[in-house]
Amino acid sequence: MLGFSSLRRYLSSFTTRPLRRIESAKQLAKTMTVLPNTYDEPVRIAVIGGTGLRELPGFTQVASLSITTPWGSPSSPITILHHQCSHNNKTVAVAFLSRHGTHHQIAPHEVPARANIAALRSIGVRTIIAFSAVGSLQEEIKPRDFVIPDQVIDRTKGVRPWTFFEGGVVAHVPFGDPFDEGVAKVVRACGHSLEGEGVVLHDRGTLICMEGPQFSTRAESNLYRSWGGSVINMSCLPEAKLAREAEIAYQMICMSTDYDCWHESTADVTVEMVMGHMKANAQNARRFVTAVLDALASDEHADLVQAKHVEGSIKFGLSTAQANWSPEARAKLEWLFPGYWN
């Protein structure tokens, strides 16, 4: 589990590339290329990168979108990437957003989750694969293992805006199964892409989402273990809840970096420990996301990627008749769901 506010300087040592390393004029020109700020086609799949996955090298960057929503601006520009599938050479557009900002300057409680989800939906996104570094709460989930959670326990403290439906309109959406099982099945089937001695993909688990940015106390860590918690992070919520409200199929992929502080045979979690495992996880994360995108791009998953199974679901959660919506709430929801309301 990560103390994100203290990672900023440490992260820069892995990401900064001095100009002296650029060995040719061609390379320099490439780094200075300005990407278009528009993209005309709908983009159905998005990857939200957290600590440990801040970029997707090997994909072709084709646009960089700066979008302003009624809930503000997202945490980073949305990069549109082209991915060429390995099995059929099909080119798939993917949106990439960095949850904590381009320079990892946004703490977990400061992430503009509503703007992130709204901006992605506005360009056509209906499926999100979200990555997050996590602490392990169980012996069998080792550092460098991956986990596909199927449940979450909310331990945030109410300081993060968590709904699109407020200020004159009320809606209650089901959240009994917080992740999309259809997308999860596709993701689990891609575990073969992970490499490294002893690396395991755990296909289910309960994720504890805590407030942060501080680490857990030992008592808290043991409490979460007693609840059956598998892993812990600071990023899943309200991201997953907002995706559900926005009718987007959402699945998180967790990358274990440490045993939190409950494990008596290891030292307490430190930034250095986390970053060592994170660096090892990064290459596996890129292999994994490539395999997942290949699978999602197949024709058999076309309806899944477009989230046809959740389309229209928010209308059943509305508690406020449209005639009674406030003008401000209506304007925001019409931006999020254009042409959706009577």
Swiss-Prot record:
It is an enzyme of class 2 (transferase). It is found in: Cytoplasm; Nucleus. The keyword Lipid metabolism does not apply. GO terms for cellular component: cytosol; nucleus. GO terms for molecular function: mRNA binding; S-methyl-5-thioadenosine phosphorylase activity. It catalyses: S-methyl-5'-thioadenosine + phosphate = 5-(methylsulfanyl)-alpha-D-ribose 1-phosphate + adenine. Phosphate binds at T51, R99, H100, S132, A133, S235. The record marks S216, V271 as: Important for substrate specificity. Keywords: Cytoplasm, Glycosyltransferase, Nucleus, Purine salvage, Transferase. It comes from the Eukaryota. Disulfide bonds: none annotated. InterPro entries: MTAP (IPR010044), Nucleoside_phosphorylase_d (IPR000845), Nucleoside_phosphorylase_sf (IPR035994), Purine_phosphorylase-2_CS (IPR018099). Its EC number is 2.4.2.28. Pfam families: PNP_UDP_1 (PF01048). Homotrimer. Catalyzes the reversible phosphorylation of S-methyl-5'-thioadenosine (MTA) to adenine and 5-methylthioribose-1-phosphate. Involved in the breakdown of MTA, a major by-product of polyamine biosynthesis. Responsible for the first step in the methionine salvage pathway after MTA has been generated from S-adenosylmethionine. Has broad substrate specificity with 6-aminopurine nucleosides as preferred substrates. NCBIfam families: MTAP. Belongs to the PNP/MTAP phosphorylase family. MTAP subfamily. This is S-methyl-5'-thioadenosine phosphorylase. The lineage of its organism: Eukaryota, Fungi, Dikarya, Ascomycota, Pezizomycotina.
